[in-house]
Every structure is written in structure tokens, then in C-alpha cells.
A protein has these predicted regions:
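Short, polar/charged, Gly/Pro-enriched helix-capping and turn/loop motifs at alpha-helix termini
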Residues: 35-36, 70, 118
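Disulfide-stabilized extracellular recognition modules
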Residues: 90, 94, 98-153
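A short alpha-helix/helix-coil micro-patch that ends at or immediately precedes a cysteine
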Residues: 15-65
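Hydrophobic h-region of N-terminal signal peptides that target proteins for export
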Residues: 6-15
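Positively charged n-region of N-terminal signal peptides that target proteins for export
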Residues: 1-3
Length: 153
């Protein structure tokens, strides 16, 4: 049996400040950034969404349990199907996945340095996000990350 630990990075209680991951991402978005030779201007801050968190959590758990990295789940689900399963209605949707970094800030830095992931981070077309990670100590990949982006209709 694989050891599977799951932790979604949930925002702090209302009124006590935003989640550090959300704050870090919004700091990245507040400044213009070049992603793979393409300049992206500063983008508005994102808000945390619990339904996106649930979808991200489910996908990290699936990847960690089955030792893979990808945008399609073992059940054949796509990001669209996973967020809709959680009741999230959307007009724009995106997903970043990663493995390896033990800390959320390191995962954000890695995404910011990858052109496609960076474009998601900087997209002004998204208004909400969530990040979750799962750990499988017996997998070569170790820590799995999913970041969901969305904009309601």
C-alpha cells in the first residue's frame, strides 16, 4: 500500500489575511513578466475558490496514488470535467501540474519559469484559483501539485 498524504493549501480564515500561496501568486501577477519571450502585463489579483480547491485536491490525490503526472485523470477526466463535478461553472479554465518541489513557493517559482505555466499564472482571463498538493513517499516524483484557474460566467 502506498503512503499517501494529502494537503490542500486552504486560505486562512476570513478576516485573518489571505493564504500565503494566493498572496505569493498575486505578487507575481502584480508585476509584468516575460514568459518564454512573450511579455505579459500585470494582471488583476485572483480570489481563492473552494470548488477549484476540491477539483485540484482530487487530481493531486489521483496522480499521487497512481504515480503519474498529467492533465488527464486515471478515470479519463479532464480539468473541465473535474471542476464541473465540483459544481464550478466557468467561462475560462486552466490548469498547471507539477511534481517535485516540497514547498508551494518553489512550485510557483517553477511554474513562473516555464513559458506555458507562466502564461496561465499571468493570464488576465482568470479571476479565481486554487492550489493543492499530495505526497506519495514511494513515488520517484514525491510531491504532486495542481493549480486550477477559472472565471465564472
Amino acid at each position: 500500500m502506498r503512503l499517501l498524504l494529502l494537503l490542500a493549501l486552504l486560505p486562512a480564515c476570513a478576516g485573518q489575511g489571505a493564504d500565503p500561496v494566493l498572496e505569493a501568486l498575486n505578487r507575481i501577477r502584480a508585476e509584468g513578466r516575460t514568459c518564454g519571450g512573450v511579455y505579459h502585463p500585470a494582471a488583476p489579483p485572483l480570489a481563492w475558490d473552494a470548488r477549484l480547491t476540491a477539483a485540484a485536491r482530487a487530481h493531486t490525490e489521483d496522480m499521487a496514488a497512481h504515480g503519474f503526472l498529467g492533465h488527464v485523470g486515471t478515470d479519463g477526466s479532464t480539468v473541465r470535467e473535474r471542476v464541473e463535478r465540483e459544481g464550478y461553472l466557468w467561462s475560462a479554465l486552466g490548469e498547471n501540474v507539477a511534481y517535485g518541489p516540497a514547498q508551494a513557493e518553489a512550485a510557483l517559482r517553477a511554474w513562473a519559469e516555464s513559458p506555458g505555466h507562466c502564461a496561465n499564472l499571468m493570464s488576465g482571463g482568470y479571476s479565481e484559483m486554487a492550489v493543492a498538493h499530495a505526497v506519495n513517499a514511494r513515488s520517484d516524483m514525491g510531491v504532486y501539485w495542481v493549480q486550477q484557474f477559472g472565471t465564472p460566467p
